[in-house]
């Protein structure tokens, strides 16, 4: 962990939301929100890429050190928690970054608490998914999308090394393994050998997943938020292969519906490496710098 890092916490309904802070003396505050089965350490490479920015990142309710916070979960509940963290950490406005499900949380936050946010960067997330086809329920759809990331929640691991091997074999990460990825993975483990497990609540994942499906033609993405915003999307998905999470026809639809939201397509990177690889973190950092 970087020498500029420290643990943080903020009071929320039901207990304390935990997370981390990097570069505390930075002039501009960035708040970064992680994905559905992730934790705040996913943003360590972004902190390295933004040495002049103070970066705050929570473990969302039901994940990491916030795993014991009670439900209900859901996108709006997470948005309320992150708003509490912003207020407890000096107040806004901040530049808000949301990756994957964190993009949905970030979009909900700017709709509900626009005064807390000066700029918004969505990273391969935040645009609602069309409801699953008839005969496919949300749990099936999310299992197909997340693959190994969801499967691990039902498993135990005999050692930290075994968990590292599981993640090293992940098709989106095996060529991008680094100290930062190893730290992110290790932080996720709770319990004791030989029954180590992920900190992520499968109940939280199931409830949060439902909030990501909505008819895109009726979705109110940013509400009355008038600050600068942009979306980065990658060409490869959660298993490291094309296509990305958002098909081209969905991007065309959103460019037409929301011309005020520039959409930048990032080649070569996948849903994980856009955040965890230095080249991906650099692209996100560049987007942050255009808004701050």
Predicted regions located by residue number:
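Alpha/beta-hydrolase fold catalytic core
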Residues: 1-30, 51-54, 92, 144-146, ...
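Conserved HGGG/HGGXW glycine-rich cap/lid loop of the alpha/beta-hydrolase fold
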Residues: 18-68
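Active-site loop/oxyanion-hole signature of alpha/beta-hydrolase fold enzymes
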Residues: 60-97
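Conserved hydrolase catalytic core segment
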Residues: 92-136
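A catalytic-pocket lid/entrance helix-loop region that shapes and gates access to the active site
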Residues: 123-157
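Conserved alpha/beta-hydrolase catalytic His-Asp/Glu region
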Residues: 154-208
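Conserved serine/cysteine hydrolase catalytic core
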Residues: 188-257
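Catalytic histidine-centered segment of alpha/beta-hydrolase-like enzymes
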Residues: 266-278
């Amino acid at each position: 962990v970087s020498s500029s890092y420290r643990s943080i916490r903020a009071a929320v309904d039901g207990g304390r939301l935990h997370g981390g802070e990097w570069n505390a003396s930075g002039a501009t505050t960035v708040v970064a929100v992680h994905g559905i089965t992730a934790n705040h350490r996913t943003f360590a490479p972004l902190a390295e890429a933004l040495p002049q920015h103070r970066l705050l990142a929570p473990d969302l309710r039901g994940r990491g050190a916030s795993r014991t916070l009670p439900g209900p979960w859901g996108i709006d509940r997470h948005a309320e928690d992150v708003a509490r963290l912003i207020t407890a950490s000096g107040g806004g406005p901040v530049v808000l970054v949301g990756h994957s499900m964190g993009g949905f949380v970030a979009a909900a936050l700017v709709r509900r608490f626009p005064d807390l946010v000066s700029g918004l960067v969505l990273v391969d997330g935040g645009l609602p998914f069309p409801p699953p086809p008839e005969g496919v329920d949300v749990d099936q759809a999310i299992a197909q999308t997340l693959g190994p990331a969801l499967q691990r929640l039902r498993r135990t691991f005999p050692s930290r090394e075994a968990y590292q091997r599981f993640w090293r074999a992940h098709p989106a990460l095996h060529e991008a393994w680094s100290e930062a990825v190893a730290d992110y993975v290790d932080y996720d483990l709770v319990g004791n050998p030989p029954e180590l497990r992920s900190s992520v609540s499968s109940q939280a994942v199931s409830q949060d997943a439902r909030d990501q499906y909505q008819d895109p033609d009726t979705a109110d993405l940013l509400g009355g938020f008038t600050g600068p915003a942009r979306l980065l999307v990658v060409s490869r998905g959660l298993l490291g292969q094309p296509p990305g999470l958002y098909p081209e026809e969905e991007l065309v639809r959103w460019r037409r519906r929301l011309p005020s939201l520039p959409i930048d397509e990032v080649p070569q990177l996948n849903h994980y490496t856009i955040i965890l690889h230095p080249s991906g973190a650099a692209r996100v950092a560049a987007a942050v710098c255009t808004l701050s």
